[in-house]
């Protein structure tokens, strides 16, 4: 009778049909049975003639109780282990991205991002003072503001967010405040592309703008010139050179429609921010290419360009020199309109226009 009653209570305990109070009382009873079993085992060791044992139902109850306590111990240990391991892994991430000072993984990545944007996006650069990075478990998130210069004014145009997992970089999420900025199209026309060499459309656009404005214009030349020659050709114009498109491949029809690669011009406010050593803009461009080649996979993801081939371009520039086939200039609208009549300018595209800030 007692065994039947105990079995019924055990089934209720096993199926979770007891109240909390009943379950607590039953577990206390199981503890007593466990002690009782130990006592009997001890006596049996001294007297093998005893034939005492606990019923199968009670044995099952004791086993179930033991399993439950074991699961609880394992769960507690798992939680404690997790709470100990997570901070250690996060600390490891901080050390991975931060150790090495200037040459740490985190700093190298942020510098690569700044250089890549400067070389692949005409007149758009990273505002390094507003750069934000956050180290997380096994990774790092970096967000950098993008700026451009129009006239003498520097304006924010958007931001780019990049996630790293260890040394791998995910495709960036780019947010432009003005969608027009994101319309890359053809910034420049390569000298080899004779069919698109015209300034008519740009001249018409500039002629409709009032005198109290400053413009950003993408100029393309009849051929590639050394940087100094470009500046000398246009030294009589009241304009600023913000970015120069550099010829980094052999002059062929195939290169006519490729995206440009270049460097901030002599009047760009962002030139000093790159902090590259060199006696001239040409030296600085070569040094920037060398730095970018160290992390070309990062640069490809950040620029969203698989055609970088930095080592080949670097080899071409070192053999043939730094020659400019196009420039981004800014200045008074009417002054740039006059500049388009220079015989060295073969095509032009109008970019952003702002109210007078010259």
Curated annotation (Swiss-Prot):
User: Taxonomic lineage of this organism?
Assistant: Bacteria, Bacillati, Bacillota, Bacilli, Bacillales
Q: Which InterPro entries match?
A: Sigma_reg_C_dom, Sigma_reg_N
Describe its partners and assembly state: The N-terminus of YhdL interacts with sigma-M. YhdL interacts specifically with YhdK.
The recorded induction information for this protein reads: Cotranscribed with sigma-M and yhdK. YhdL and yhdK negatively regulate sigma-M.
One of this protein's Pfam families, by short name? Answer: Sigma_reg_C
Which residue ranges traverse the bilayer?
A: 74-96
Keyword Transferase among record annotations: no
Membrane association type: Single-pass membrane protein
Q: Where in the cell is it found?
A: Membrane
What is this protein's name?
Answer: Probable anti-sigma-M factor YhdL
């Amino acid at each position: 009778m007692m065994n039947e009653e105990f079995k019924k209570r055990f089934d209720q305990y096993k199926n979770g049909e007891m109240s909390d109070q009943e379950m607590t009382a039953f577990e206390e009873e199981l503890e007593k049975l466990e002690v009782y079993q130990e006592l009997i085992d001890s006596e049996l060791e001294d007297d093998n003639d005893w034939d005492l044992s606990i019923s199968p139902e009670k044995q099952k109850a004791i086993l179930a109780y033991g399993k439950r306590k074991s699961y609880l111990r394992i769960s507690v240990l798992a939680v404690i282990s997790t709470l100990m391991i997570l901070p250690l892994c996060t600390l490891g991430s901080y050390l991975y991205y931060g150790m090495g000072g200037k040459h740490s993984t985190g700093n190298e990545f942020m510098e690569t991002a700044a250089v890549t944007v400067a070389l692949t996006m005409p007149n758009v650069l990273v505002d390094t003072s507003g750069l934000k990075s956050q180290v997380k478990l096994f990774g790092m998130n970096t967000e950098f503001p993008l700026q451009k210069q129009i006239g003498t004014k520097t304006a924010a145009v958007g931001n780019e967010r990049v996630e790293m997992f260890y040394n791998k970089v995910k495709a960036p999420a780019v947010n432009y405040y003005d969608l027009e900025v994101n319309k890359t199209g053809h910034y420049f026309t390569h000298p080899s592309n004779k069919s698109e060499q015209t300034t008519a459309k740009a001249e018409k656009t500039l002629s409709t703008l009032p005198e109290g404005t400053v413009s950003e214009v993408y100029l393309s030349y009849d051929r590639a010139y050394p940087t100094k020659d470009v500046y000398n050709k246009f030294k009589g114009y009241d304009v600023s050179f913000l970015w120069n498109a550099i010829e980094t491949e052999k002059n062929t029809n195939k290169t006519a429609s490729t995206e440009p690669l270049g460097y901030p011009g002599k009047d760009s406010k962002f030139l000093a921010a790159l902090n590259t050593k060199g006696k001239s803009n040409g030296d600085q461009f070569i040094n920037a290419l060398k730095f970018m080649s160290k992390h070309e996979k990062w640069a490809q993801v950040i620029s969203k360009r698989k055609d970088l081939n930095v080592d080949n371009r670097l080899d071409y520039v070192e053999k043939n020199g730094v020659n400019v086939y196009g420039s981004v200039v800014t200045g008074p609208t009417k002054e740039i309109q006059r500049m388009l009549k220079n015989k060295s300018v073969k095509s032009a595209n109008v970019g952003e226009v702002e109210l007078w800030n010259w």
